[in-house]
């Protein structure tokens, strides 16, 4: 049978399965593709095909991630599933697979476990907007009261990490029953019920092009007789010739007007998310702008020096540090296009951080950088990556 061509006319959404090891994340991923394949919305991908996930590199870190795609009545989905716990931590922190929402898989037989808690915390820290819960292996639990107890536990845990625990949809079912066609209610029907909830409960992400304009500065040239041209890839939004923008980061914020946009040496009337452009800036001197700043819609992004972050520190085998670090550690933080030195303050009770740890920390940069929550960065020492992080909240 020929592979069905995915229609791109449906809104797109990125999701993933998260949860404790062996609670059934990969089985559920396989089950979703199986059930949706019945209506032509997917190609069935078996468990063992998903489980041997290829390795990818993101921000200098190797991560194993499996990708499947499928569609429901309403949306087209790209779905990520990771084989190991460390891969989830790295994936969520580096944003290698951006998640607009996630399906938290909890085994009804075991209830919430340590990684269930850790994945919920990570989802909160890295800014995953919404979770839907699949209570898996319900065919192994005969006592309905026990199921209710597990559901209550999951809701309490979600609320503890500031997700709306009492509102989040929890679907009871069995991925195995769906894969083996053994119990229609817990298998087939539960998967469809899950996808209906994912469709309705996970908000449709705003497309990059609809967000306020932002472009990281990669290079600055001065063109005699024309002025200063700044090049970079537009991260989001649209910039039109004649619009006012701000130059933010490193030094005091400046306002200027874009008097020209070019791409591949051709003049355009606008540049948009994904385009590599050169922007001609009115009355701006070559020395007024530098790599590491951003051009943005006025007032949309502010420069900051202090923030809380969630970070993953590479192991020695991954090319990271061989030794732990302590509070007042001073590496470089690579934001978008440049390194800035910063000082790390560890939370109370954390003496040191070992290679391979993930950690919440406070960072004070020596110069301000245009930043907002969810912005990713690399932690570097002399140009080599020793960690990755994400801005969890801004202090000042």
UniProtKB/Swiss-Prot annotation:
Catalytic activity entry: GTP + H2O = GDP + phosphate + H(+)
Binding residues for GTP: 19-26, 81-85, 136-139
UniProt key word Transferase: no
Major localisation: cytoplasm
E.C. numbers: 3.6.5.3
Ranges for domain tr-type G: 10-206
PROSITE patterns, sorted: G_TR_1, G_TR_2
Key words of the record: Cytoplasm, Elongation factor, GTP-binding, Hydrolase, Magnesium, Metal-binding, Nucleotide-binding, Protein biosynthesis
Region (G2) residue spans: 60-64
Family statement drawn from the similarity comment of this UniProt entry: Belongs to the TRAFAC class translation factor GTPase superfamily. Classic translation factor GTPase family. EF-Tu/EF-1A subfamily.
Protein name in the entry: Elongation factor Tu
Protein's organism: Bradyrhizobium sp. (strain ORS 278)
Recorded name of the encoding gene: tuf
């Amino acid at each position: 049978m020929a592979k069905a061509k995915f229609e791109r006319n449906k809104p797109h959404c990125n999701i993933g399965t998260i949860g404790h090891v062996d609670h059934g994340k990969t089985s559920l991923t396989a089950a979703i593709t199986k059930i949706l394949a019945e209506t032509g919305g997917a190609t069935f991908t078996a468990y063992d095909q998903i489980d041997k996930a290829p390795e990818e590199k993101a921000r200098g870190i190797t991560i194993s991630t499996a990708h499947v795609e499928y569609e429901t009545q309403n949306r087209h989905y790209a779905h990520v599933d990771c084989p190991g716990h460390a891969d989830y931590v790295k994936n969520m922190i580096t944003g290698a697979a951006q998640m607009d929402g996630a399906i938290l898989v909890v085994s009804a037989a075991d209830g919430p476990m340590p990684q269930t808690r850790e994945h919920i915390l990570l989802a909160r820290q890295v800014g995953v907007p919404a979770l839907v819960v699949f209570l898996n292996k319900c065919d192994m639990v005969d006592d309905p009261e026990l199921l209710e107890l597990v559901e209550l536990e999951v809701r309490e845990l979600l609320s503890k990490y500031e997700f709306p625990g009492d509102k989040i949809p929890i679907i009871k079912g069995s991925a195995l029953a769906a894969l083996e066609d053994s119990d229609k209610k817990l298998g087939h029907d539960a998967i469809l019920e899950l996808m209906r909830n994912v469709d309705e409960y996970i908000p449709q992400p705003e497309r990059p092009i609809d967000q306020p304009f932002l472009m990281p500065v990669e290079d600055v040239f001065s063109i005699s007789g024309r002025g200063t041209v700044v090049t970079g890839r537009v991260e989001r939004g649209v910039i039109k010739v004649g619009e006012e923008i701000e130059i933010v980061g490193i030094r005091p914020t400046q306002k200027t007007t874009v008097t020209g946009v070019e791409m591949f040496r051709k003049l355009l009337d606008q540049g948009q998310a994904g385009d590599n452009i050169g922007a001609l800036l009115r009355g701006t001197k070559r020395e007024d702008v530098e790599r590491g700043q951003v051009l943005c819609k006025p007032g949309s992004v502010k420069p900051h020096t202090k923030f809380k972050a969630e970070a993953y520190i590479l192991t020695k085998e991954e090319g990271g540090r061989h030794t732990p670090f302590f509070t007042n550690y001073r590496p470089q933080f690579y934001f978008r296009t440049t390194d800035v030195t910063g000082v790390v303050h560890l939370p109370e009770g954390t003496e040191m951080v070992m290679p391979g740890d993930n950690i919440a920390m406070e960072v004070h940069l020596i110069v301000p950088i245009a930043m907002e929550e969810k912005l990713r960065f690399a932690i570097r020492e002399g140009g080599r990556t020793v960690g990755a992080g994400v801005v969890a909240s801004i202090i000042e």
